[in-house]
């Protein structure tokens, strides 16, 4: 059996899977991204996880595909990821290749990887144009146009989370203010809800009462 290892690096968790040629996930493994405070120590955890999956799976591993925030497809590096403690430019492809010995190791932005997966195996198989929006520790999007993934000149097309939504708004991990993901992401949704409640509490409560009234 031929298979590949898929890696999804998030700001909170890192998830891995053994995937066959049909796109079926045969095995899963995960660990906390937040258990590591720098790139070198994180790579030790990732290498250990990849090695565990390959050693416990019969067949031939054809390579590793990695989806990560600010993953640069062209350079094989994770660049300036606000929610990861990796620094300016983390050479994840080169580091993993040297450790596990696989030639075919590829990196892309996590939302781009999700969009490509939908195009090949999921709901986008019969669509030529669509956008996948990912919501987790951050906010991202992957864009398919004319059946092809849009990478952009520098590999960062579709960085929806860092579009300015509120001028001079909340401080983002990227250093700018008002980025969309500071208002709409897993770790910021509660803050947005709290601010909304304080700003217009009376109308919010009235709306809730109306909703419950209709349900009766």
Model region roles, listed by residue range:
Residues 17-19, 27-29, 39-41, 106-108, ...:
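Glycine/GP-enriched mid-protein hinge/lid loop-to-helix segment characteristic of carbohydrate kinases
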Residues 2-3, 128:
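Short, basic/aromatic recognition patches
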Residues 34-35, 39-47, 51, 59-64, ...:
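Glycine-rich phosphate-binding loop and adjoining helix at the ATP-binding site
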Residues 3-44, 77-79, 155:
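Short glycine-rich, Thr/Ser-proximal phosphate-binding strand/loop in the N-terminal lobe
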